[in-house]
């Protein structure tokens, strides 16, 4: 069974609603030209979700819409938070959870991330569980222990039959310009699949798509595509320019 491929652009705290609309007026036609086999998506800021939703409908685009985070409860006294029902109003398909910036800047813990993963899956929004080791952990030779721990804890609340996507992003390669080699990435992804087989089953593990993120650019996307356990990309800075992001998508399918 061939795994589904995904390429997601994470805009982080960039682009107003107007800027997002201008972006999609360029990107949606480019995506149609590229006609990728992969499912392509973007995660704008919460304030731009409505504008993106409307633009995607206007262009009749297959582009997926994602969110950068979400609260695990459907409502409540949680100032500044966004709920899953709110995301569903904008036809959100997927949500990033456990991104390294949320873990390290906002101190999100694995137990909280697990609750979010389970809640998203139950609401019909695909959780994208982000994992990855820090430079300190890597230098200590403890990468596998950290990845295994993040997977086991982060997936603890996932319903048995629910879909999930894993995104491996070595923290030391995010926004630093440092890029993990294709060999290193393949080894990490293969290890993650072994862990998934232990958590679920070998059959389930073979169905789960694992994406790579970490200074992904148009000129290295093709190399990652050749790795047998890399099923797509989570793109940061290179997704902020519509033409560059379209090149990333095109090169991944060469």
Swiss-Prot record:
Catalytic residues (UniProt): 99 (electrophile), 169 (proton acceptor)
Signal peptide: none
EC number: 5.3.1.1
Main location: cytoplasm
Enzyme kind, highest EC tier: isomerase
GO BP term (any one): glyceraldehyde-3-phosphate biosynthetic process
Cited SUPFAM superfamilies: Triosephosphate isomerase (TIM)
Alphabetically ordered keywords of this record: Cytoplasm, Gluconeogenesis, Glycolysis, Isomerase
Coiled-coil blocks: none
UniProt pathway: Carbohydrate biosynthesis; gluconeogenesis; Carbohydrate degradation; glycolysis; D-glyceraldehyde 3-phosphate from glycerone phosphate: step 1/1
Classification via InterPro entries: Aldolase_TIM, TIM_sf, TrioseP_Isoase_bac/euk, Triosephosphate_isomerase, Triosephosphate_isomerase_AS
Keyword Isomerase belongs to the record: yes
One Pfam match: TIM
Catalyses which reaction(s): D-glyceraldehyde 3-phosphate = dihydroxyacetone phosphate
Cellular component, GO, one term: cytosol
Taxonomy, superkingdom: Bacteria
GO MF annotation list: triose-phosphate isomerase activity
Residues annotated to bind substrate: 10-12, 175, 215, 236-237
Family: Belongs to the triosephosphate isomerase family.
Subunit structure: Homodimer.
NCBIfam families named in the record: tim
UniProt function note: Involved in the gluconeogenesis. Catalyzes stereospecifically the conversion of dihydroxyacetone phosphate (DHAP) to D-glyceraldehyde-3-phosphate (G3P).
Identification of the protein by name: Triosephosphate isomerase
Record lineage: Bacteria, Pseudomonadati, Chlamydiota, Chlamydiia, Chlamydiales
